[in-house]
Amino acid sequence: MGYLFTSESVSAGHPDKVADQISDAVLDNLLAFDPHSRVACETMVTTGQVIVAGEVRSNAWADLTTIVRDTVAHIGYTKADYKFDSESCGILSAIHEQSDDINRGVDRRSPEEQGAGDQGMMFGYANNETDSYMPLPLSLATDLMITLERIRREGKEMTYLRPDAKSQVTVRYDDNDRAVGIDTILVSTQHDEFITAAEAGSQQAADEQMLARIRRDVIEILIPRTIAERVHTPEIKQMLAADDIKYLVNPTGKFVIGGPNGDTGLTGRKIIVDTYGGRGAHGGGAFSGKDPSKVDRSAAYAARHIAKNIVAAGVADEILVQLSYAIGVAEPISIYVNTYGKRRVALSDGEIAEKVRTLFDLRPYAIEERLKLRTPIYTETANHGHMGHQPRFKTKTFKCKGQPDKQIEVELFTWEKLDYVDKIKAAFGL
């Protein structure tokens, strides 16, 4: 009979993502001037206000006001009509120094023996249903948001778009867990009030005309551009172009009030969007605003790196990797693997987990070094998910009061590199 599976994504202007991007912008600025910074930065955004709180231990200084205003402006909140804009929003800082007790558990005489910054379990997942080794429903939902944001920034089509938006994609699977079609696509996008009651004859007529226009543009502009610009597999292109897809566009009928004025946003509230869209599992720890001594972040990236390379090497078609840590302890407490019965080698999941232990050094310091996590790479992760992107180099410029500007070339999304495939094949005799 098969089944349906659904995942969602959100835009850069979603309130929770605004908060994530501010937290990671603060983190990046501190790491740019002091790579050994310890940071836990939490942000709340609401009508006309940004509150930044958390714990920091660093030799760098962050110009919080400039960082916040630049981040909000880059996202697109630049108009007073939004009731949250980069020029006028109030900014409150409640940042203080990191606890000595936590710092004592992390610092060691030898950096290699650096302890984990907290306890917890972290998961990495990969499958082979997309070329990014990501689940198809989340991959498509993310592609829709990336394309919609590109359209908004270009300002040539769908010129009524505002920054806040969400997507949701429901995929049909057969009994063998193979994607066979797309059942439903949902797009909710904030928009200007581009047809007035005076022009339409009544407010109801204006709302209906705006909704009809947005629905048409989603189907005739957003979907074709997503297929052309984001989807590379012929089978998935065909699925997305099918005539029998059910479309839900702005189901409430109108979406003018949005962003932090419509909903208060908090750092760390989109952890499923940030990872695998509900596939696999999640340990509960958020990523944004945390330096890599926090294994919530660094070990989740390491687990994704392991999972992706194992699937790419042909060990399994699907895999979930769990790592667990204790605060102050360097070595992981446990390594767990689940291949869902889809392994291609004559080994049990437990035996695969032992291979993982020998192939990958999973101490926090080793993860930081291998994935280059002590560099200012995090703002880019806070939008459109932390997993599934192409690794790339980028030159970034940072400003700090009393110091010359700093230009740094960084490598983004290192945990998406397929640099362990050959080692894994050799270890498994493939």
What are these regions (language model features)?
Residues 8, 12-31, 129-150, 290-314:
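Alpha-helical support elements that line or immediately flank enzyme active sites
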Residues 8-10, 14-19, 115-130, 256-281, ...:
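Conserved phosphate/anionic-ligand binding catalytic regions in large, soluble enzymes, centered on
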Residues 39-59, 327-331:
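Short, charge-patterned binding micro-sites
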Residues 46, 318, 325-430:
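Internal helix-turn-beta structural module
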Residues 269-271, 276-322, 331-339:
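C-terminal catalytic subdomain
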